[in-house]
Amino acid sequence: MDLDRLKDLIKKYRENMKYYHDTKNAYNETECRDEYINPLLECFGWDVQNVQGKLPQYKEVVVERFSNYSERPDYTLTLNGVSKLFVEAKKPSVDIVVETEPAIQARKYGWNANHAMVILTNFEDMLIYDTTIKPAPGDNARTALYRKYYFEEYAKKFDEINAL
């Protein structure tokens, strides 16, 4: 858990935010994951790079790679090899607070795995959904929303987020 690193990440994002939202720059999800979401998870104590050298079946974080369209979440957070939480990532230009499809996608992952919650993030926003509520036609991005954090809040609400 590294609060100083998190503050640096927030500062870097704030300084470059317009670039990430400009579709001409083609800043993509993979870049966002590498530059922001991986470090964000590490700031909250998750071993994304498997620095501990755990066997593949016991890694803390399983990262989905090399796919433009996947039916698996971008990250599976585990405890002793047992899936506990999914994190679905999007690029910053995707407005996850408003757009329905990313929310439904993330909620389906959590619902199908019988998880209590799922995280949807583009780094700028972190949405935590209650996945004990089945996704249904007509749902929107606010349906089953448990918590919402803006990137500027991550450091201030570090303990609250980490406790989830």
Language-model features and meaning:
Residues 123:
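Carbohydrate-associated surface elements
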Residues 1-117, 128-163:
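A short, conserved, highly charged catalytic patch centered on acidic carboxylates
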